[in-house]
Amino acid sequence: MPFECVPMRVWGCTALLIAGLMCVPEARAWEAVTDGLPEQTVAAVDKSRQRFFLMEKGKSRDYLCTTGQVQGDKQVRGDLKTPEGVYFIVRKRTERLDFEEYGGEAYILDYPNPVDRLRGKTGSGIWVHSRGRAITPFESRGCVVLNLKDIAEVGPELKRGTPVLIGERVEIASRKDAVRE
C-alpha cells in the first residue's frame, strides 16, 4: 500500500468508528466541548429539546428549532424523522423555494452520508431552513427548521462544508466543565 493512502485510510476508519458509536445508546447523549475549537463554525441540533446550537470562535449561541414529526433516527424515505449523525452543508439554495414551507433560504445537508448508506438508510432532501411563519416543535418532515429571524442570523455562518451534528440529546460545555465531571 502506498504511503499516501495510509492517512486517508486512518481518517476513514476513525470517521466510521465515531459514526458507529452513535448506534450505541450510551454514545447518543454526547457532550461537545467548545473550548479550543479551531475557527471553524460547527452547528449541532438537540432533537429532544428542539434546540439548534451554533458554535464559533469558542462561543455558543442557541436557537429554537423544529425537527421531524416522528421521533427517532431517520431510516427510510418518508418516515418523517430527522436523521442523527454528522452531516455537512453541501450548498445554499435560494431559488424557487415555497416561502411558506422553506422561507427564503435553505442549506442542503449531505444526507444520506456514506455511513448512512452502509446502514441501509434511504431518503434525501434534509435541509436546514426556515418557514414563512412561526415554527412549532416536532412539525417538520425531517428537516431542521428555524424561525425566519434566526436563519437570517445563522445563515451567513452556514458555509459549504460546515459540520452539522444532529443527535437526540446534545450538551454544550466548556472544556473546564467537561474536565470537572
Q: What kind of feature is each model-predicted range?
A:
Residues C23-A29:
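Sec/Tat signal peptide C-region and signal peptidase I cleavage site
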Residues W30-V42, T66-D79, G85-R93, L148-K149:
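N-terminal post-signal-peptidase region of extra-cytosolic proteins
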Residues A32-P38, K81, R93-E181:
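Exported/periplasmic cell-wall-interacting domains
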Residues F52:
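Gly/Thr-rich phosphate-binding beta-strand-loop-beta motif of the actin/hexokinase/Hsp70
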